[in-house]
Swiss-Prot record:
Keywords: Toxin. GO terms for molecular function: toxin activity. There is a cross-link at residues 11-19 (Cyclopeptide (His-Pro)). Belongs to the MSDIN fungal toxin family. InterPro entries: Amanitin/phalloidin. Processed by the macrocyclase-peptidase enzyme POPB to yield a toxic cyclic nonapeptide. POPB first removes 10 residues from the N-terminus. Conformational trapping of the remaining peptide forces the enzyme to release this intermediate rather than proceed to macrocyclization. The enzyme rebinds the remaining peptide in a different conformation and catalyzes macrocyclization of the N-terminal 9 residues. The keyword Lipid metabolism does not apply. Probable toxin that belongs to the MSDIN-like toxin family responsible for a large number of food poisoning cases and deaths. This is MSDIN-like toxin proprotein 12.
Amino acid sequence: MSDINATRLPHPFPLGLQPCAGDVDNLTLTKGEG
């Protein structure tokens, strides 16, 4: 998971409580690049 996206974009879940790091990372990538 990219810390840059985590720091730049708001996360729906606190770090460590994410249901799936892969899903959250995909969402951040979509929002950041889209």
